[in-house]
Structure formats: structure tokens, C-alpha cells
Amino acid sequence: MNKAKFGPMLLALALFAVFLLIPTRFLLPLLSDEKVEQAATSLKEEKIQSMILQQKMLADPKYLPMYGSSEFARMDAFHPSNYFKVKPEGFTPFLLGRGGTQDLVHVLNFASTMDQLKDKKIVFVLSPQWFVPQGIDETHFAPNFSKQQGYHFIFNNDLKPEMKKQIAKRLLNFEIVKKETLLKISLEGIAYDDTKYKVKALAAKPFAYIYRNILDRKDLFTAMFNIKPHKEKLDPSLKQMNWEEARKHADQTGAVESGSNEYGIEDDYFNSKIKKKLKQREGYLKNDAYDQSPEYEDLQIVLDLLKQSGAKPLFISVPVKGPWYDYAGFPKERRELYYKKVHEQIEKAGYPIADFSNHEYDKYFLKDHMHLGWKGWVYIDEAIQQFYKAN
């Protein structure tokens, strides 16, 4: 009688335990290819932080992962996601970035998927504004930090020990990480050689493992039911244009959409964020600099991770809008220090860089004072297409 009563309950518990403990890769077939395709243009927090979507995407050769930040939200007709839909080149861009997803966020992206990156072509878009003197702060890191990726990082035994220690110490600088007790204990066991930290981390390990798997299952359900594509903005006329014609078309579009100001800044952005405070903005960046920042160390971790994983990245160096930065008091020679430093760092790592720093005064290269748009996207599209087609 008791066996009959408790049998179904025990079976349910056993099935739940199996579902909880089996490796995540065995759950990938539950996520449809259609869902991954829909997620390619999504910029939702849940998508950017999702491991299962990244794993499924990286397993499909049709996707070209693009890592960056808030420029991806400037989704006009020239944006890679829209341009290559109108004029296919054999790949689909998969966007991994939104405001605040700087190098350290992408360190976790790469550390948690490095076993899938070998020989994988990827695009990495750098923003000068990442390289402020304090580097990424809590305000930008916290909304983009993925606990799930953090737990996967601590169980990644393929990382070189010194690199793993460096990343763990860096993560422990942030309150959002330290508030996650299990993760904090586990990271301290990696970051510090003191025995007390090692013992605590060892005791926490089985609980961290189970919690990681719970987060993986939550991620699966979110990816299945809560990720929607970004609204498309397609221009069919681009299909018949060569690169020069597309750039001219982008210039014309930019001129129409930024007629309210002399800087070539999109009307909506200028009128809502700048116009009323234009006088106060004169000289407001005179004390800023991008040539000394912890961000360079975070970028070096990105480079080292990509080297260890065997990935094939193209880095893209985006300029600032020259006339606006002149007005704001950030001198050109100081901007040049950043461009030169980041270019040399990437070249030293042995990776190609599409450097567009000479386009500061190309009026419609950027949509505002720092985000790509219009003509800038056309240049990026061409660089991506050439990179993808090259052996």
C-alpha cells in the first residue's frame, strides 16, 4: 500500500533529479532553431545573459557572433542585422551587447563558451567610452552581470590558473557579485591562496553546482518563451547597391534625419538630449581621457581568452564624433592616444583590427556623438563581409 502511495512521488523526484543533474548540453535540443533565429537581433537582458542561446548559436555555423555594447540598438536599415537580411552573404549576425556590456562582461561570455570558440569567426566592436579612468563601474556592470555565467566560470577547469585567478579577483570588485554568497565564496577560493578560502570554496562546491544547474534550467525556459526579435527596419533598395552607392545613400539618409543641427546628430537624439543643454555642454569633457583605464587590462583578458580558445576575431575600433568632442573640450591629441593604444594592443595580440578612427569628421558615420549609424554601419558591413569571406 505504501509502495503504491509513494511510488509516483519517488519516480517524480528521480526524474527531477535527472533533469537537474544532467549536463546542459543534453538540453540544447529542447530549444528550437527558430527561437535562436528570433533571438539573433534581441537586445533583452535575458538574451544577452543567456548561456543556452549562446551555446546553441555557436553550434550553428550560419551565425556570426557580434560582441559589443549600446551601438547595436541603433538599428537603422544599414545595421548589419538589417543589411545582411536584405543582401545575404551566407551568415546571420547574432548580437551580444547592449548598454554597459564592456570587456569584463564579454570575458564571462567567452569564459563560459570557450570550448565552442575554436576556429569560430567573431566580431568585437570597441567603444572609446568604455576606457574612462575608472573603467566599468557598478552601474554598468550590475545590470549586465549573469550569475549563470559566473557559476559556469568557477567550474571551467580549462582556463589557465593564473588567468582564472585574475578574472576571479576582478569580479570580486563588484557588489553585485559579492551579494551572491555561494559565488563569492567560490570566487574567493580561486582568487586567494589562503587555506581558509580554499576550504570554504570546497564545502560550497556541491551547492554551487546544483544552483548552476537550476539557473541553466531557468535559462532554458526563458529562452523558449520570453525572447522576441527586435523590430526590423529593412531597405530593399540596398540589395542592388555596391558599397560606394550604399555609403552615398547612407549620407543622404543621415542628412535628412539630422537636419536640426550642425553636428550630424540624429534629430530625435539631439532634440531630446542635447538641444536644451547645448550651452552647458561646451567644454564639459575637457578633463576626460581614455588612455589610462582598467579597461585595458580587461581587454587584455579578452585577448588572452580568445587566444586560448582558438577563436578568430575581427576587432572594430569606432571613432567619436570629432566636431562634438571638439566643442565638448576633449582635444583631438588626447583622443589619438586612445586610438593608438588600443590599436597597438590588439595588433600585438596578433589579431586584425578594422580601425575607423580617421572617420571622426565623417559627418554621418555616427548617429550621435558616440554611436554607429548610417554611413558608419555601411563601413562596418563591408569590413564584416570581407572578414567573413577571407580564408
Task: Write out the residue ranges for each language-model feature.
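C-terminal regions of proteins
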Residues: 96-98, 333, 338-391
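Alpha-helical transmembrane signal-anchor/signal-peptide segments
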Residues: 25-47
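Catalytic nucleophile-elbow at a beta strand-turn-alpha helix junction centered on a G-D-S/GDSL motif
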Residues: 57-78
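Substrate-recognition/cap regions that form aromatic- and gly/pro-loop-enriched pockets
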Residues: 288, 306, 314-318, 325
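Membrane-embedded segments
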Residues: 72-162
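Short, flexible/disordered intra-domain loops and linkers
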Residues: 135-141, 325-334
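Secreted/periplasmic serine-hydrolase-like ester/acetyl group-modifying domain
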Residues: 151-297
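Hydrophobic membrane-insertion alpha-helices, especially the h-region
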Residues: 5-25
